[in-house]
């Protein structure tokens, strides 16, 4: 498996460093060993302008990323920084969605679901999942990004090469 890391930027602006060890598109969450109660109850899928229920997601493809995360100097570690995007014409960034599954998450109903304790200089390996509709996007142009709403100079893109 090719390991993919984000481009390195200005070191003082890096709070979390991560490596995508593996990206796998499964036919459904069950194939990925993800149970229904581990998936967010309502999944926003802005690419096609729909909200996806857990029941729908259980019968839909799921992208699972195996990611190693290292806390460089962040006070609050939160997987919501990770977003899927598709790069369209002229490298236009089209948001696909937020994670709907997180291996370290405890309670999908909790507002703290996406948070994880990780002290500076510590690392954790985790699995992060997204509902994805392969008919609605070009799999070869899907990227993992961080800091999507921040400045472009602080945003990294990792081509998942699906």
Residues covered by each model-derived region:
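Conserved functional micro-motifs across diverse proteins
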Residues: 1-162
């Amino acid at each position: 498996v090719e390991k993919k890391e984000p481009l390195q930027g200005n070191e003082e602006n890096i709070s979390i460093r991560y490596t995508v060890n593996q990206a796998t598109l499964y036919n459904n969450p069950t194939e990925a060993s993800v149970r229904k109660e581990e998936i967010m109850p309502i999944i926003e899928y802005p690419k096609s302008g729909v909200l996806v229920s857990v029941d729908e997601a259980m019968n839909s493809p799921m992208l699972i990323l195996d990611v190693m995360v290292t806390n460089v100097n962040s006070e609050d570690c939160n997987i919501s920084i990770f977003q899927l995007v598709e790069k369209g014409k002229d490298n236009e960034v089209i948001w696909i969605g937020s994670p709907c599954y997180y291996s370290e998450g405890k309670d999908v109903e909790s507002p703290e679901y996406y948070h994880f304790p990780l002290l500076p200089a510590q690392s954790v390996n985790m699995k992060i999942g997204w509902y994805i509709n392969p008919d609605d996007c070009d799999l070869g142009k899907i990227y993992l990004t961080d800091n999507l709403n921040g400045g472009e100079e602080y945003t990294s893109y990792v081509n998942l090469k699906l």
